[in-house]
Amino acid sequence: MTKLGFLRLSYEKQDTLLKLLILSMAAVLSFSTRLFAVLRFESVIHEFDPYFNYRTTRFLAEEGFYKFHNWFDDRAWYPLGRIIGGTIYPGLMITSAAIYHVLHFFHITIDIRNVCVFLAPLFSSFTTIVTYHLTKELKDAGAGLLAAAMIAVVPGYISRSVAGSYDNEGIAIFCMLLTYYMWIKAVKTGSIYWAAKCALAYFYMVSSWGGYVFLINLIPLHVLVLMLTGRFSHRIYVAYCTVYCLGTILSMQISFVGFQPVLSSEHMAAFGVFGLCQIHAFVDYLRSKLNPQQFEVLFRSVISLVGFVLLTVGALLMLTGKISPWTGRFYSLLDPSYAKNNIPIIASVSEHQPTTWSSYYFDLQLLVFMFPVGLYYCFSNLSDARIFIIMYGVTSMYFSAVMVRLMLVLAPVMCILSGIGVSQVLSTYMKNLDISRPDKKSKKQQDSTYPIKNEVASGMILVMAFFLITYTFHSTWVTSEAYSSPSIVLSARGGDGSRIIFDDFREAYYWLRHNTPEDAKVMSWWDYGYQITAMANRTILVDNNTWNNTHISRVGQAMASTEEKAYEIMRELDVSYVLVIFGGLTGYSSDDINKFLWMVRIGGSTETGRHIKENDYYTPTGEFRVDREGSPVLLNCLMYKMCYYRFGQVYTEAKRPPGFDRVRNAEIGNKDFELDVLEEAYTTEHWLVRIYKVKDLDNRGLSRT
């Protein structure tokens, strides 16, 4: 038999090949597990914000960067409009357009929509690779491979990176971990080269997502802790000063960011730590030149003077408005009740709600239990890099509890620390395995004081293997059932187990596009603005950007008012059509009736809506009901009438009266009414979307037609 010598590799080469194979499999798994939605439905954009991102990306790919940067969108926020180039983070769009043009350069003809659909899964594969390298810097390659495999399927990250989820977070998590990796390399080496690469990665992060504020506060916090623990060195000084100076200059090139890095409160911590670095370096220089007594006197004097000057200058700048205060979302992170009490538009967003305990297990499963193990290992073997990952883990744990959206920021560090924890447990017990045959064991070995060492080690390894397998099954199930359903196309199981598709949203937008005038203005709640603009190509009053609370409040006032009062508002805003989402027939719970109280709160939050009181829409016992016991104010408002018009004659379930709402589980209280100021224009197949046309003004005393 011929010996195949070329297959005989050295141990080092086998090790490298195995690592490459495992990492490649993790990257492929990361991409493929996010394709459930495409396989089950089709290549379609999900949710709401991604439709705006897709629309702007398409404009960039077709018109070029110059027109994109100077684009004024007259289809949004009528009659105000919106400047697109200066009000978005363009990293996502530029990345997609660049990939699109590169593929076309090589004559790979792919539609820009498909580039957008598959971008997040592609970057999740890149995230897997970066996670491996980052974890390797913290422990070793084994921990890195485990962390990479974990982040490939962790539901907390998949929720924002499935195929079709074309949002900023799809590439931002990759940018964030890349910045962290470069930062740790810069801290370890003290090299300007790595620090400059960290600044470039940070620039990419700034261009992609507003969450960059977390980075520019976490890195300075890391430096501050290193100072307080006596670990500050020349390496840290070079790394941070380079990252801060270069990163700040680069970040200011993003139009939406502008001068915020030197003017806003969110960035002042980074600037303050930069100043502390200079003071620390100067103090070290003086210490080397003066005797201890002279240094002590000078040090106290300088610190007192500098501290007083900084506090005075900072207070003056904030009082005069030179340094802008924290934004509402930032206040909400520090005080979870702030948005609920002061800014209802922020509190109304579901992803801004506090996280429930069950969400942690649902999105992280095994990682919840292995995270403390990895944290313990890092505390037991402290280094500059491990202090950073500890701080990342602790801070992201807090922020994820305040806002469910930030589970996305927590998921990567959970994978990293869990990978370290699992790796440490397996390494510890692997050493206790005895793979020699029992009959060849020496008597000395058999009489050991730890006779069942091998059995305990085998048991622990099997337990860890079982938990890792259940984690994989759980993650795959959550991905398939919870995070792979595009909100634009809904599905349900029929009585015979078959899948029923509800395509009402696209049906309604298609009708709007082809059956309404080009200059028609559509009023809907802000959730659906991006979809209407992108798919129906019609002008809308408010959308998901939510930059003008007064304008949104005006729409809320119209929805919460009687027909007569609402008609005045609609004529004032030049509304042609009104669109509402209604789930009473199909059982769709995310409809406008369930969102209605937020319309009331936001509508009543401005001066023009002071007459709208939330308590008026409750029963005397404090209940929100749509049946006969419901508040008369609710039963006669515009939103109620648009949703339930003609619904009183519809049978929704067997043995139930007509007009039975399957979401609220109640027979509606106001059935027999007609619309005075609106006329029904279109209702989709399953009544999910209802469109009404606003009647013209009275003509010399005649009724509206």
Curated annotation (Swiss-Prot):
Reactions catalysed, as given in the entry: a di-trans,poly-cis-dolichyl diphosphooligosaccharide + L-asparaginyl-[protein] = N(4)-(oligosaccharide-(1->4)-N-acetyl-beta-D-glucosaminyl-(1->4)-N-acetyl-beta-D-glucosaminyl)-L-asparaginyl-[protein] + a di-trans,poly-cis-dolichyl diphosphate + H(+)
Site (Interacts with target acceptor peptide in protein substrate): 49, 351, 595
Keywords, ordered alphabetically: Endoplasmic reticulum, Glycoprotein, Glycosyltransferase, Magnesium, Manganese, Membrane, Metal-binding, Transferase, Transmembrane, Transmembrane helix
Pathways involved: Protein modification; protein glycosylation
Motif interval(s): DK motif: 592-599
Pfam families documented for this protein: AglB_core-like, STT3
The protein's assembly and partners: Component of the oligosaccharyltransferase (OST) complex. There are 2 OST complexes, OST-A and OST-B, which contain STT3A or STT3B as catalytic subunit, respectively. OST-A and OST-B contain common core subunits RPN1, RPN2, OST48, OST4, DAD1 and TMEM258, and OST-A contains DC2/OSTC and KRTCAP2/KCP2 specific accessory subunits. OST-A complex assembly occurs through the formation of 3 subcomplexes. Subcomplex 1 contains RPN1 and TMEM258, subcomplex 2 contains the OST-A-specific subunits STT3A, DC2/OSTC, and KCP2 as well as the core subunit OST4, and subcomplex 3 contains RPN2, DAD1, and OST48.
Protein name: Dolichyl-diphosphooligosaccharide--protein glycosyltransferase subunit STT3A
Organism: Mus musculus (Mouse)
Gene giving rise to this polypeptide: Stt3a
